[in-house]
Curated annotation (Swiss-Prot):
The lineage of its organism: Bacteria, Pseudomonadati, Pseudomonadota, Gammaproteobacteria, Pasteurellales. Belongs to the adenylate kinase family. Keywords: ATP-binding, Cytoplasm, Kinase, Nucleotide biosynthesis, Nucleotide-binding, Transferase. GO terms for cellular component: cytoplasm. This is Adenylate kinase. It comes from Pasteurella multocida (strain Pm70).
Length: 214
């Protein structure tokens, strides 16, 4: 079961990815996590990626594809995997085909921009542990402090409203064509395509996914 999740940053893909992983026992391959790992490790790729991400720009295809190819070859991907944040462009989608990766399901999470901005600009992160909070949906017990350590929470650079808006512009201009691409693939019988309303309650979206993937 090889699955692609499509949707803007903050559309709820990460939450539903957890549900799919737990339900079906396949790993999530998140380019965001891979990139943050590379940035934390201070690799050349990480340094290049950080500069671009801080400016709200996308990381170029060749850097991402090399990360993804390496990851899907690992043993835990034998039964399938979940791609989150990749592909983002038609060349990336073509690159998946070129390296022989057949996608079974494409799941699009549809959420209006204004909802995304509210969701993302409210995120707060405990840097050392990666624990994430939200001022509206999942607030810490003490405002601005981590529940476990009491240390300060930060706003990641890519969660600031102006950066979120920049990322949404980039998303709409580069990733929206993927919707057409994969809908055409679905019509040709090469994959299955489903659009989900990402503004619904988490449990409702999970239930829909359960039905689709069962």
């Amino acid at each position: 079961m090889k699955i692609i999740l499509l949707g803007a940053p903050g559309a709820g893909k990460g939450t539903q990815a957890q549900f799919i992983m737990n339900k079906f026992g396949i790993p999530q391959i998140s380019t965001g996590d891979m990139l943050r790992g590379a940035i934390k490790a201070g690799t050349d790729l990480g340094k290049q990626a950080k500069t671009l991400m801080d400016a709200g720009q996308l990381v170029p295809d060749d850097l991402i594809i090399s990360l993804v190819k390496e990851r899907v070859a690992q043993a835990d991907c034998a039964k399938g995997f979940l791609l989150d944040g990749f592909p983002r462009t038609i060349p990336q989608a073509d690159a998946l085909k070129t390296v022989g990766i057949q996608i079974d399901y494409v799941l699009e999470f549809d959420v209006p921009d204004e909802v995304i901005v509210e969701r993302m600009s409210g995120r707060r992160v405990h840097q050392a542990s990666g624990r994430t909070y939200h001022v509206v949906y999942n607030p810490p017990k003490v405002e601005g402090k981590d529940d476990v350590t009491g240390e300060d929470l930060i706003i990641r650079a890519d969660d600031k409203p102006e950066t979120v808006l920049d990322r949404l512009k980039v998303y709409h201009s580069t990733t929206k064509p993927l919707v057409d691409y994969y809908q055409a693939e679905a019509k040709a019988g090469n994959t299955k395509y489903f659009r989900l309303d990402g503004t619904k309650k988490v449990e409702e979206v999970s239930q829909e996914l359960d039905t689709i993937l069962a």
